[in-house]
Swiss-Prot record:
Glutathione binds at residues 60, 85-86. GO terms for biological process: detoxification of inorganic compound; glutathione metabolic process; response to oxidative stress; response to superoxide. Its main location: cytoplasm. This is Glutathione transferase omega-1. Belongs to the GST superfamily. Omega family. Residues 21-101 form the GST N-terminal domain. Pfam families: GST_C, GST_N. The gene is gsto-1. The active site is at 33 (nucleophile). Exhibits glutathione-dependent thiol transferase activity. Has dehydroascorbate reductase activity and may contribute to the recycling of ascorbic acid. Participates in the biotransformation of inorganic arsenic and reduces monomethylarsonic acid (MMA). Protects against environmental stress and oxidative stress. GO terms for molecular function: glutathione dehydrogenase (ascorbate) activity; glutathione transferase activity; methylarsonate reductase activity.
């Protein structure tokens, strides 16, 4: 995999659009956004040579509105065409670069993996519960019960080493960023009672713990992810409405 610009500083309102040479592939990213990380993981897993442009999505770029009507990340650009939304980008990438296809070509198997990814969106919905606790620690017991339920459901859905089977695939790459955000939250004092080492816990979630360790240590994830320390700090700042440092850790 060849990703350049992963650790580049975020561009913001007033910055010029970086030139993109013909035939080049670009990912517009926000380093701490789980939705953007979905696209980054998929690009990395497919081994696409890509330039990464990190964005400040608070102080939005004027010209970026022509790429994404909401000014959000992620977006991918290739040969003058822009595709947005983390739920659509993976399928586009599989169709545009079929030689490294991740989703199965068999119609039935493809639908099964998409359904599994859809069921795992419950993990994404758990993240805002932790934002609420970051703002008010008295909500911890109430919110973490719901998080634990979601993790148990995810544990029960894991029938193999990975959600896609013997190797990580579509449901793994689309769900991992949200498990990671729960892991980040676990490192903050008083937010959720989960370990950061052997996350989310071998006793309660043995299959999920092995899965997470395999994912977090993989070359694909390591090529795009942020550290536990910086990720947790950014999450806390976002949840508590502090000024956001999009270049944290650079």
């Amino acid at each position: 995999m060849v990703l350049t610009g992963v650790t580049s500083k975020a561009i913001r309102k007033g910055d010029a659009e970086p030139p993109l040479s013909k035939g080049s592939f670009r990912v517009y990213n926000m380093r701490f956004c789980p939705w953007a990380e979905r696209a980054m993981l998929y690009v990395a897993a497919k081994g696409i040579e890509a330039e990464v442009v990190n964005l400040n999505v608070t102080d939005k770029l004027e010209w970026y509105w022509t790429k994404h009507y909401q000014g959000k990340a992620p977006a991918v650009e290739h040969n003058g065409k822009v595709v947005i939304e983390s739920g659509f980008i993976p399928e586009y990438l599989d169709d545009a670069f079929p030689e490294t296809r991740i989703l199965p070509t068999d119609p039935y198997e493809k639908v099964q993996q998409k359904l599994l990814a859809d069921r795992l969106t419950a993990v994404a919905h758990a993240v805002p519960l932790l934002f609420a606790v970051m703002r008010d620690r008295t909500l911890k017991d109430e919110k973490q019960r719901k998080v634990f339920e979601v993790l148990k459901q995810a544990e029960n859905l894991l029938a193999n080493d990975f959600y896609a089977g013997s190797q990580p695939g579509y449901p793994d790459y689309l769900s991992f960023p949200f498990f990671e955000k729960i892991w980040w939250s676990a490192s903050l004092d008083g937010v959720v009672d989960l370990p950061t080492i052997e996350f989310p816990g071998e006793e309660e979630y043995p299959k999920l713990t092995k899965w997470f360790q395999k994912m977090i240590s993989s070359d694909v994830v390591q090529s795009v992810t942020q550290s536990l320390e910086h990720g947790a700090a950014f999450m806390n700042a976002y949840a508590t409405h502090q000024e956001l440092n999009y270049d944290l850790g650079l």
